[in-house]
Amino acid sequence: LENTRKAHLLDGIAVTKFMYWLKKNVGKIPMDEVSVSDYLQSLREQMEGYRDISFDTIAGYNANAAMMHYKAEPDTAAKLEPQGMLLVDSGGHYDTGTTDITRTFVLGPISDIQKKHFTMVVKSNLNLANVKFLYGCSGISLDVICREPIWKENLDYQCGTGHGVGYLLNVHEGPNSFRWQYRPGFDNPFEAG
């Protein structure tokens, strides 16, 4: 666990530097989904013990952020402006472990519906972060707790809430997952290990 914490600390430094750079420069210098992805990777490469990205970075601007596993291409990458949202799903392999994080950056004015949806996601994350669960609790239970603020609005998202992360292996490491649909063999109880 200590190594995993170290990996996330290193990765968090790179992501924080990226966030500062993005907020300071959006609308002032040309940037698109590919260039911001490349810049974030360059920051990770400066971290001690960095090995490689843990998966291809997903950087989706505005409508592109809603497409699961979107892949920006140099010739079609959306240009970033000082408005709307940028979703970045990314991670790195470090000597101390593997990371996978998703962050949404508000780059400027957004609509009321975007504010409402963003707030529902924050509430969902807080639900999950604050839950106290007993030994043997499964991903299904945690997923439902996380989705509750979104379900209250008769909305949903089609992907799982979470997944196992390998240690310098596959970033989507089975069989553990957080999803509300039951899949035999893919929902092990959570145990300290």
Give each language-model segment a name:
Residues 1-193:
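Active-site neighborhoods and metal-handling regions in enzymes and metal-associated proteins
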